[in-house]
Regions:
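Short, Lys/Arg-rich, polar N-terminal cytosolic tail immediately upstream
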Residues: 1-16
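A structural signal for multi-pass alpha-helical bundles of membrane permease subunits
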Residues: 12-16, 20-296
Length: 296
């Protein structure tokens, strides 16, 4: 039995929907303000003359780019070799090398492991799936000391290997790739096998080309995570010429004072690549998350 809604009922429902919409918009606005205020303060401080006292204004006064120039050249004072001075460009290059290697090689390792877990049956498969998921639940600080001892034993301290190799495989990456691969029709793999293709050829020419959304998502996630690494490089890297940008920002904090203008200029330069990356690839990022959530 269908009951027709009276005009008063329709008006009441529209009013409720408007109130809900207003409340949601208000929550989003408040959340945006809370999230953006620190960034606005950082940008205002970077564009204002350097000061030893933290400024309180969100509007820069006497706008200047001096802080960016000084921040770029500030590391020269800490360079162990005057003939090859260290600048912010050195730290950017270190971060770029680590980010590109972790992102590119990590996607290969995660996708290969996920392909096996999605398309192959073998003894202990469920255990490997469980272990991949379990690594997402273990805090990084639990494994920090054992990993450091291994790195020291291998004599990788102050090398790129120490900052790259431990993070090539990730439980989250394997899980997302596997979830996406499970949504792919198994007939595609079988057709490739009938044509005489090996497992690796099926993976390379059939599975990966139709997995671009999840590849894009994982590339963004891995790039953001590796670019923002702080604790691990701080521990395994004591050579200033090998430090990534996030660790190098510490030099603007002295024992008794902080160069706020230089630090905020350095932080602005440090986050700029990630902001550009996300703005250029946000559609792929959202589409990849949706694609990876089809099956578990």
């Amino acid at each position: 039995m269908v009951v027709d809604k009276t005009p008063n009922t329709l008006v009441s429902e529209r009013a409720k929907n408007r109130v809900k919409s207003l409340v949601m918009n208000l929550i989003l606005i408040v959340g945006s303000v809370v999230m953006l205020t620190p960034l606005l303060w950082m940008l205002a401080t970077a564009l204002s003359p350097n000061t030893k006292i933290p400024p309180t204004s969100l509007i820069p006064h006497d706008i200047t780019l001096e802080n960016f120039v000084e921040a770029w050249n500030f590391p020269k004072a800490f360079s162990p070799n005057p003939d090859h001075p260290v600048t912010m460009g050195t730290f950017f290059m270190n971060s770029l090398i680590c980010t590109v290697c972790i992102t590119a090689l990590g996607i290969i390792v995660d996708s290969l492991a996920a392909y096996v877990l999605a398309f192959k049956d073998f003894p202990g498969k469920r255990l490997f799936i469980f272990l991949a998921l379990a690594t997402m639940m273990i805090p990084f600080y639990v494994t920090l000391v054992p990993e450091y001892l291994i790195i020291r034993k291998l004599k990788w301290i102050n090398t790129y290997k120490a900052m790259i190799i431990p993070f090539l495989a990730s439980g989250m990456g394997i899980s997302l790739f596997r979830a996406h691969f499970l949504s792919i029709a198994k007939e595609l793999e079988e057709c490739g096998k009938l044509d005489g293709a090996s497992d690796f050829r099926v993976y390379l020419t059939i599975v990966m080309p139709i997995s671009r959304p999840i590849i894009g998502t994982m590339a963004i996630l891995k790039a953001m995570w590796s670019w923002n690494q702080y604790m691990w490089p701080l521990i395994v890297c004591t050579d200033i010429s090998k430090k990534p940008i996030q660790v190098a920002l510490n030099m603007f904090r002295g024992l008794n004072l902080t160069e706020w203008g230089y630090m905020c200029a350095g932080m602005t330069m440090a986050i700029l690549p990630l902001v550009i990356l996300f703005l250029c690839a946000q559609k792929q990022f959202i589409g990849g998350l949706q694609a990876g959530a089809v099956k578990g």
